[in-house]
Amino acid sequence: MPVDAAEYAAALRQYAAGVVLLTVRDDIDDVGTTVTSLMSVSADPPLVAIGLAAEGYPAEVLQSIGSCAVNVLGAGQAILASRFASAGRPSARHLLESVPWRRAPVSDAIVLDGALAAMDCTVHSVVPAGTHVVVLLQVEGVPVLADGDPLVRLRGRWTDGAGAPLRRP
């Protein structure tokens, strides 16, 4: 018996997820997208997995380039998460004009200086999964590691680590 799409979406909204900004530097520009489907896969070798819409440009660019940065966002970075979750967004560099960042050593992707953590990654493998792809990323380095409250997505809202909704600045 097929699962009702609305019930499926409602069930997943009950699951709190950390928020990351995935960035890729291609031959022309920088691409970034907000992702809530990050998980640790292995400590040796260090692998994480992300889910991306199979037909989306970020998945296409990531598979073509083969490397990226994964920036773990803090509770004070909800505006950034919203910017990079919007359809038809401009270059990542334009969306980060007032935000300090640098290049990751291996991927050359954007790493946010204010992220809680940033992982410099190469693509290990890609697994088709319905409307999405699951991308296994090998972590080549951790150029940013800080302490702070994480940004969390819960019930369609940005929240802090305790689940309290964040107010717009």
Q: What are the language-model segments listed below?
A:
Residues M1-P169:
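Basic, polyanion-binding surface patches
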